């Protein structure tokens, strides 16, 4: 199996559904109180593609499904509801979130992240599949220049500085994809009428 660094055609996702999934274990006690334990440290997204608007959409999904060999290969998917590190309705900025990494004058590698914060609760999501050309990075809120000051591994989300930061706060932002695979080996297309085809194609996030 392999991960194919290609984005699922976003033009045929407008009829899709899906979003994040968590795994929680709940035990109900005798008095009706609950004991809740989170099983996963990280969310796992699930999606479903269900409708195609044009003949080209149908050709595209058939070609893509065969190329991925069903569930075998992974690929990128744009989640239209959550694909930017800041607000989903504004362009990413170099100061969206503090990156994960040690600032000590030695370490040069920092992980792109998105932080979801409500009150004192925060979930830090590692961004492993940033979109090429969208990454912006800053030191103490001063925007730096890709290649001149740092490089980005767009297959892992790791930002590598040419010179290790010493005391600065490292921040960054980007657009990103979700690493996924098809969650079926069967492409079950329904011919409801002439040139009208629907389907239920499950897609699930994979850990990379």
Name each model-derived stretch.
Residues 40-42, 105, 154, 165, ...:
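Surface-exposed coil/turn segments at beta-strand junctions on protein surfaces, enriched
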Residues 62-149, 174-208:
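Extended beta-strand solenoid/passenger and fiber regions
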């Amino acid at each position: 199996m392999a991960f194919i660094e290609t984005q699922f055609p976003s033009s045929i996702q407008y009829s899709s559904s899906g979003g994040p999934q968590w795994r929680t274990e709940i035990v109900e006690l005798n008095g009706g109180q609950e004991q809740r334990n989170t099983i996963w440290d990280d969310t796992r997204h699930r999606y479903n593609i269900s409708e195609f608007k044009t003949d080209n959409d149908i050709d595209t999904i058939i070609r893509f499904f065969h190329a991925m060999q069903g569930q075998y290969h992974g690929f990128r998917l744009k989640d239209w509801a959550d694909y930017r590190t800041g607000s989903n309705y504004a362009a990413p900025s170099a100061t969206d979130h503090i990156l994960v990494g040690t600032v000590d004058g030695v370490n040069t590698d920092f992980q792109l992240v998105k932080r979801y914060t409500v009150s004192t609760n925060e979930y830090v999501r590692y961004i492993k599949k940033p979109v090429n050309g969208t990454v912006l990075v800053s030191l103490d809120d001063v925007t730096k220049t890709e290649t001149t000051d740092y490089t980005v591994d767009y297959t892992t989300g790791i930002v590598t500085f040419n010179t290790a930061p010493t005391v600065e706060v490292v921040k960054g932002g980007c657009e990103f994809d979700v690493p996924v695979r098809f969650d079926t080996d069967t492409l079950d297309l329904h011919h409801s009428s002439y040139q009208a085809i629907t389907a239920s194609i499950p897609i699930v996030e994979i850990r990379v």
